[in-house]
Amino acid sequence: MAAAPVLLLAAAAAVVVVAMVLRWLLLLGGPAAGRLGKRALMPPGSTGLPLIGETLRLISAYKTPNPEPFIDERVARHGGVFTTHVFGERTVFSADPAFNRLLLAAEGRAVHSSYPSSIATLLGARSLLLTRGAAHKRLHSLTLTRLGRPASPPLLAHIDRLVLATMRQWEPAATVRLMDEAKKITFNLTVKQLVSIEPGPWTESLRREYVKLIDGFFSIPFPLANLLPFTTYGQALKARKKVADALREVIKKRMEEKAENGGSIGDDEGKKEKKDMVEELLEAEGGSFSEEEMVDFCLSLLVAGYETTSVLMTLAVKFLTETPAALAELKEEHANIRDMKGKKQPLEWSDYKSMPFTQCVINETLRVGNIISGVFRRANTDIHYKDYTIPKGCKIFASFRAVHLNNEHYENARTFNPWRWQINNKLQNAVGANIFTPFGGGPRLCPGYELARVVVSIFLHHLVTRFSWEETEEDRLVFFPTTRTLKGYPINLRLLSESIC
């Protein structure tokens, strides 16, 4: 009996190996391989070793603070668009802003988004990330309706309260892993936006399962993973079910409430405050969204809100700490804002619009940190670019990082310099030239990008006006499987004597 799990694991591994061998043989001899084999038409490059290609080199590079050589060396040899072989298939990499613009704009026509099967299974087929065409447009529009209006006074007040509630746990001094604290803020904020539930035992229980789900995104999706709960992916599948069940229970209850009220949430003020994403879904298109569509959609928004914004908050503090002049200027900007307000008065939209240097810091953190290093697409048809033809079915990676850190586009591109964004129209020009795409672009432009800026701005305001801090130990950035600091950025915090927190 004790040998059973081992035998199952061995069988699963054998299935994976056989599948990879068959895939490789098909690439060499199948119909699509006829097009792929015409090397003169494909962008130049190297496919590396059989089966694994250059995957190990890519992972090795992205597990260091300096992954640039992987792309830089190939760009130097082959140009801004080159071919490699990673994660089981031949892939075209683009460090060319013009080609990246084409790929982002062509979503749903010449290309479609493509992600590893591990991510697809854990998010659900009806998630915002994976839907295409009219279905994606429908969900994207709804997300914009809810998340694209950060100027809402109730939302700003809630963000302010949530940030302060977290920071009060640090008084009068504390040692924290800043990334963990930031993730608590972004998770609780996203849950509030989705289902109107305040932080408490329910949200903390959900967050613990959610962390396990996230861990499975870049693990190996063994065919028998549901029978192998001791693997990272198996644990992620179990956590996914628990998160989905918790969301489903809330959605069912809200559907019942809506039915009892004759299809309306009612007119009293308390119910109007419950106008969250679930309510938007229940009212949209005559209530045509199914229960499972709503579960997948809400789960995918948890991913978007939880991971990226919390990393942005952490990296902003890390980069500021390493750049004292920038930190001093940021402190001055926020001290001036606080001096003009009552001591305990929450921030308002006009305050947010009075943070120009803060926006420079956020822009530069996005550019240098590259929380989203790029996006994968798959060709729906043969794509002709310059002298190359990328065949239908080929995977393409548009690298934002390679563009953001290119000295041809930014002077001393790998140096954190928020003052570069003070130049007139710098942001507009960079976006227009497609050399600044931290939130993607085209039909899949991140619908919550402005909300993310607001959250980070409010967080930085309260941090610099209430606390001093210092790093407790050296921490470094890594970029695989996602952008993060290796140790969660541990810092010592001390409440300022004049703070009103």
From Swiss-Prot:
InterPro entries: Cyt_P450, Cyt_P450_CS, Cyt_P450_E_grp-I, Cyt_P450_sf. GO terms for cellular component: membrane. PROSITE patterns: CYTOCHROME_P450. One of its GO terms (molecular function) is fatty acid 2-hydroxylase activity. It is found in: Membrane. It is an enzyme of class 1 (oxidoreductase). The chain crosses the membrane at residues 2-22. Its EC number is 1.14.99.-. Its cofactor is heme. Pathway: Plant hormone biosynthesis; brassinosteroid biosynthesis. Pfam families: p450. It comes from the Eukaryota. Keywords: Heme, Iron, Membrane, Metal-binding, Monooxygenase, Oxidoreductase, Transmembrane, Transmembrane helix. Its main location: membrane. It is a single-pass membrane protein. SUPFAM superfamilies: Cytochrome P450 (SSF48264). GO terms for biological process: brassinosteroid biosynthetic process; brassinosteroid homeostasis; sterol metabolic process. Heme binds at residue 446. Belongs to the cytochrome P450 family. Catalyzes the C23-alpha-hydroxylation step in brassinosteroid biosynthesis. Converts 6-deoxocathasterone (6-deoxoCT) to 6-deoxoteasterone (6-deoxoTE) in the late C6-oxidation pathway and cathasterone (CT) to teasterone (TE) in the early C6-oxidation pathway of brassinolide (BL) biosynthesis. This is Cytochrome P450 90A3. The gene is CYP90A3.
